[in-house]
Structures are given as structure tokens and as C-alpha cells.
Amino acid sequence: MRFNLLGRVHVITDAGCVIPLKSSKATQLLVLLLLRRHEVVGSGVLIEELWADHPPRSAMTTLQTYVYHTRRLLGEHRVTSDDRELVLTQPPGYFALIDEDELDVAVAERLIRTGGRLLEENRLEEALASLDAGLDLWRGPALSTVPCGRVLESNIAHLEELRLFGMQLRIDANWRLGRIGPMIPELRSLVISHPLNETLHAKLMGALCQMGRRAEALESYRNLRRILSDELGVDPTPEIQRMHMEILNGEKVLV
């Protein structure tokens, strides 16, 4: 069994059947319990996620109904071969009883964490394999088919940061392995999606310069300077300005 949240939300049963989880408050509740696996999530937190500051008078009863529907859905589809209960009641709320390998988020976190450790140990190929495996679990934006309240929105932000962290580690591993050229398309994509991340801009500038594409590296700097000026009214960091001068002077650039 595997719950997959990193993209369109679905569950793969022990029998190998793929069960899409419909966009509903019951799915919203289940996803929050999965992300806080082995932790009792209070009814108040669940009500906040589902209705924010405007819960109905029947919120507690309706919450119990959603839990019932969730359990029935998982039971009807025989998600587990042993029919074990996955959503348990424990005051003051509920919790999801699943193993780490039964949730793609947990697997991704472990693989990226392992990749970072291997990178620190200079085991570059092993680090890259672990990071690739972790990042490949993303099939699109996390929780893309689930309505999200403010509690889940914070979880989405965490998952986006985790993905970015893993991608930066992978860039570092490839850089240290001398595989600079193939990183440029990914870096270009990253600076578009994270335009205020100066570290990514610096990596792109350095990669372009290393590949002999000095004009493009300088254009990348001008683009960063314009974005920072327009959005924040500041200049690039002194380190990036120094890199810019090194590129202008044809000196060796260190990133």
C-alpha cells in the first residue's frame, strides 16, 4: 500500500489497484492525518483546516461523519490486504496508523536526507542516486487535487522547500562531479520559479561561465539585478557582485 500525495492524490492498494481520492473534505481530512502520521491531530485543528474561522454549529458531528466516510472508502477498496484500521480515534482527535514506506512524502524526506548525508561524506554518485530517487517521487505540485485550508497550506510550503532543498543538493552533487552543462536547463527553470533566490542565480551564472557562455552569464546577472531592484529595491549580495566582476574580467569564477 502506498499513499501518494506529491502530485495528484491517490492510494495504491496492497493488490496494486490505483484509487484516486476525490476532491472532498473527507480527503482533506485524511491527507492532514497522513502528513502528521503517528501524531494525534486534535479535532480543533481538523475543524480549523476544514472551515477556518467559520465552522458550522454542527462542526464536530460533521467531522465525525467525514471520518466515517474516510474509513468506509478505505475499507470498501480493501486498501490493505489485512483490513487493518488506518484512521484511529484517540482523544482529543484522530491519527493515521501507517508505516513510513506507505507514504511517498516520508520516503522522499528520507531519500533527500540520505542524499545530503552522502554528499557530506563525498560519496557523490550514491548521493546523486538517492537524491534522484527522492525527487522523482514528485509527479507535480503536492496535493494538487485536494482542497487546502491554512493548515495544509503550511504543509505544502514545507514540501515545496523540501523539493527545492533536494534540487539544490543535486545541483551541488553534479557540480562536484563535473557535470555542469546538463544542470543549466534545470537552473534556468529554478530561477524562473524562485526569482528572488540569489543562490540559484549565482549557480546559473557560474555554470554558464564554466561552459564558456560568458555573455549569457552576464545577462543572468543583469536579470537578477533588475528583479531585486524592482521587487525589493536592493542590489545583489557583495559576493554575487564580486562574481560579476570576475566574469567581466575573464577571471576564474568560484561558486
Curated annotation (Swiss-Prot):
Pfam families: BTAD, Trans_reg_C. One of its GO terms (biological process) is phosphorelay signal transduction system. It comes from the Bacteria. Residues 1-98 bind DNA. This is Probable actinorhodin operon activatory protein. Keywords: Activator, Antibiotic biosynthesis, DNA-binding, Transcription, Transcription regulation, Two-component regulatory system. InterPro entries: AfsR-DnrI-RedD_regulator, BTAD, OmpR/PhoB-type_DNA-bd, Sig_transdc_resp-reg_C-effctor, TPR-like_helical_dom_sf, WH-like_DNA-bd_sf. The gene is actII-4. The lineage of its organism: Bacteria, Bacillati, Actinomycetota, Actinomycetes, Kitasatosporales. Transcriptional activator of actinorhodin biosynthetic genes. GO terms for molecular function: DNA binding. Belongs to the AfsR/DnrI/RedD regulatory family.
